[in-house]
Amino acid sequence: MANRDKMQKPDWMNDEEWAWFKERTSSLDLIRSDAKADVQAYLANPAGRAAGTNAQGGFPTLLLTTVGRKSGEKRTTPAVFMRHGKDLVIVGSLAGYDEHPAWVLNLNAHPKCEVQLDFDKYHAVSRDATDAERKALWPSLVKTFPAWGYFQMQTERPFAVK
C-alpha cells in the first residue's frame, strides 16, 4: 500500500468507526502491538471469543500459535476466522500492507500449528487454499469480516487464505 493517507472510508463504516480503524491500522508497529494486547485479553477471558461475542468488533476470533521460521520459537497471534465445514479459514491481510503477516510465513515454513477456540486448544496442520477454493470462499470471508475485502483493494499482494 503506497499511501495509507489516500485510503477512502468504506460505505459500511460510520465516521467514528473509520477514525478508529484508520488510526489502529496506521503502522505495522501499532498493528503488532495491538495483536500482542489482543492475545493477552483473549487468554485472560477466552469465553465467547470464537463466536465473536467477547471480541473486538464482535468478530469470531481464534488464537493461532506457529513456530517461528527463523527463531524456532512459538509465536501466538489472534486471527479472525470463518468456519467452512470442519475447517477454520483465516486470511493473511495484515491490514492491506504490501507484506505478508509473519504468521503466514511461519505456516509456510512449518505448517503444524496450534489453534485455541475459547478455552479449547487443538493441534492443526495449515494449508493454502487452492485458487478455486479461494475464489469460492472469498465472498463468505468478506461477509464474515468486511475489512478483508477493503484491505485487499489497498494492495496488489494476494492475501494468503489458509
Regions found by a protein language model. Give the residues of each.
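Intrinsically disordered, low-complexity segments enriched in polar/charged residues with Gly/Pro
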Residues: 49-55, 66-69, 100-102, 138
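Short coil/turn segments at secondary-structure boundaries
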Residues: 54-57, 152-156
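Catalytic adenosine-cofactor/nucleotide-binding cores of aminoacyl-tRNA synthetases and other
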Residues: 162
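Short, structured beta-strand-loop surface elements
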Residues: 4, 8-27, 94-148, 154-157
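Short beta-strand segments
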Residues: 58-95
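Short helix-to-loop capping/linker segments positioned immediately adjacent to catalytic or ligand/cofactor-binding
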Residues: 50, 71, 148-152
